[in-house]
A protein has these predicted regions:
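Beta-sheet entry/capping signal
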Residues: 121, 131, 269-274, 309
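An acidic-aromatic substrate-binding cleft motif
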Residues: 271, 290-326
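Short, glycine-/Ser/Thr-/acidic-enriched flexible segments
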Residues: 232, 277, 317
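Polysaccharide-binding surfaces and accessory modules of carbohydrate-active proteins
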Residues: 1-241, 258
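Short Pro-Gly-centered flexible turn/kink motifs
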Residues: 262-281
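Short, structured beta-strand/loop micro-motifs enriched in basic residues and often containing a Trp
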Residues: 246-256
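Short, Lys/Arg- and Gly-enriched loop/turn segments at beta-strand edges
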Residues: 278-290
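Composition- and surface-driven signal marking solvent-exposed, interaction-prone regions
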Residues: 135-139, 287-292
């Protein structure tokens, strides 16, 4: 069974398999083409959520420390989907469960009317009888970010990374897959290396090395995928390859990268860090335009917006902390 979502120039395609598993096959401003899927495992690896609990075996074919074939993420079963509208736009809630542990997982997708951006987060609930140790949970997971177009990933894809630091703010750079260690070294259908393109932060200075943002440009299709992680603490995103395709996963803190760990007691719930993801035709300018509209939409109402006071920011010490009213 296929579920097609078309909203605000975004196209999403879910599949419910014969094994009662739900897959996210597509998220893009471009239309879905079945022939673009080129995986040795078919659609099996297109999981919408990855969640890793302590002490569980991960039997799938994977390499390195990347967050693929997580357990119980790989065995989650589809339970229900809610599709409704609220004050901001369309809302999807995809409910999954792992009966052996009693873990219930809800993937939340919030659309915003007229904006090609979603907000995504994951909610966990322990319906079992034992404590569960959470080491990782994705806020957004998408396999197949490379699938549109006929050229190789080396030829068509660019990753845009935003370095940021004290006195070195907002340094955006473009990289090819080869420059980041992800050049093609295996036949397309079986790519699953141990290499990752990983960017993150540990601690409450969330932008001390990088901005919690990124973009993936497909030069062949002239489309761009972009994202931000909405977190003032630890966060992490990674791009890598799995079963013939490349994936993007966004999250808050993790056990491996930032020594984060959550003990989920019976009856407890936990919500992951929210992230926003969008897609557009064009390049960074179009991505920035959609993201700016989204940021304006989510900003809470406050007195500053009404009174609009003039605030001087001594950015880059232009007046060395000694401004005047003149």
């Amino acid at each position: 069974k296929r579920i097609e979502i078309k909203e605000n120039n975004l196209n999403m395609v879910y599949e419910i398999t014969d094994e009662n598993e739900i897959k996210l096959l597509h998220f893009s401003n471009l239309p879905f083409d079945e022939n673009d899927i080129n995986s040795c495992e078919g659609t099996a690896s297109f999981r919408p959520v990855e969640v890793l609990l302590s002490g569980l075996n991960r039997p799938g074919e994977r390499h390195g420390t990347k967050y693929t074939y997580t357990a119980p993420g790989y065995r989650l079963k589809y339970k229900d989907m809610k599709d409704y509208r609220n004050e901001t736009g369309r809302k999807l809630e995809i409910l999954m469960e792992d009966k052996p542990t009693g873990l219930e997982v809800c993937s939340n997708i919030q659309f915003y009317d007229g904006i090609s951006v979603i907000r995504s987060w994951t909610e966990l609930k322990n319906n079992g009888e034992e404590d569960l140790g959470v080491e990782y949970v994705s806020s957004f997971a998408l396999l197949g970010i490379d699938k549109e177009g006929l050229l190789s990933t080396d030829e068509k894809l660019e990753v845009l990374i935003a370095r940021n630091a004290w006195q070195k703010e907002l340094i955006w750079n473009r990289f090819s897959m080869d420059q980041l260690g992800m050049s093609i070294s295996q036949p397309d259908k079986v790519r699953r290396s141990s290499q990752t393109i990983s960017v993150g932060n540990t601690g409450n200075w969330s932008t001390k090395n990088y901005l919690p943002m990124g973009c993936l440009k497909n030069k062949e299709t002239d489309s761009i995928l972009f994202w931000q992680i909405e977190q003032n603490g630890s966060w992490y995103w990674e791009i890598s390859d799995q079963d013939g395709h490349m994936y993007l996963q966004l999250s808050g803190p993790t056990e491996h990268q930032s020594h984060w760990w959550k003990n989920l007691k019976p009856g407890d719930t936990f919500a992951s860090v929210p992230v926003s993801v969008g897609s557009a035709c064009g390049d960074v300018e179009e991505a920035a335009g959609e993201l700016t509209k989204y940021r304006r939409a989510i900003r809470r109402k406050n007195e500053d917006n009404e009174k609009l006071p003039v605030i001087f920011n001594d950015y880059m010490n232009c007046l060395w902390g000694d401004p005047t009213t003149e």
